[in-house]
Amino acid sequence: MKQYLITGGTGMVGSQLVNEIKKSDSHITILTRHDQISNDKKISYVNWAKSGWEHKVPQNIDVVINLAGATLNKRWTPEYKQTLMLSRIQSTQALYELFKSRNKAPKVLFNASATGYYPPDLFMSYTEVYKTLPFDFLSDIVYQWERFAQQFEQLGTRVVIGRFGMILSNEGGALQTMKLPYKYYIGGKLGSGQQWYSWIHINDLIQAILFLINNESASGPFNLTAPIPERQNLFGYTLARAMHKPHETWAPSLAMRLILGQMSTVVLDTQKVLPNKIQALGFQFKYSNLKMALEDLIKE
């Protein structure tokens, strides 16, 4: 039986990942910030907001999956920016300190990250070979998060970093936010409309995570995005078609930056990111193009 330790296991990605892992011979320990009782013999919860939580984590953990982190979908006040950073750094460091104090390190760590690692660009295509230093707040979060995760290599753990693109899901996240203006017939171009959206269907994301965990040759950063990214204007048009709604309005960049503040970088300052490394290992995307993904997710 394989032992998993998961942070962020009750979130959008984590909950679906847990349901998939349960299909195998496994036991899953989920770290949460509140007391929770499990009715499933394959799952146990540990409240790591309480002192002594370390002693409740099983000794024989094989796989650590670190998805913990405050949501980006809130206005980035100075206080919340600190929360965004610390929620990722402190949780990763706590996991490292836990296993550093033990004689048995996990075989593999899968640590979430984001395509915000790469600088915004309208023309460049980014693969995993591109390396950079932080250039804005979001890239600094990503850079620090990855750096803290890489400490696990000192313990002999194989470290896999998944740079998530825009996750498309019916359970929340970006797609539900993007659907709202179209629902009320006010969807359209955002800014220039030329910025890239490097997206991924959540089912492909879950399968990619498990593929990388189980592939012993996989290590380092992986772009977890669909093979065919789209520019925002075409993305919006495709979404409108799937919802049988118009795509006719325009929200200027200046207006969006005034309304959203620094959070506007998530929709305006984006990158074209390609999943070359995971494809080279043989991973096959089920939803490689946007039309196919949206038709699966949207039943209007």
From Swiss-Prot:
PANTHER family membership: EPIMERASE FAMILY PROTEIN SDR39U1, SUGAR NUCLEOTIDE EPIMERASE RELATED
Source domain of life: Bacteria
Name by which UniProt lists this protein: Epimerase family protein SA0724
Species this chain originates from: Staphylococcus aureus (strain N315)
Family (UniProt): Belongs to the NAD(P)-dependent epimerase/dehydratase family. SDR39U1 subfamily.
InterPro entries linked: DUF1731, Epimerase_deHydtase, NAD(P)-bd_dom_sf, SDR39U1
Pfam families (alphabetical): DUF1731, Epimerase
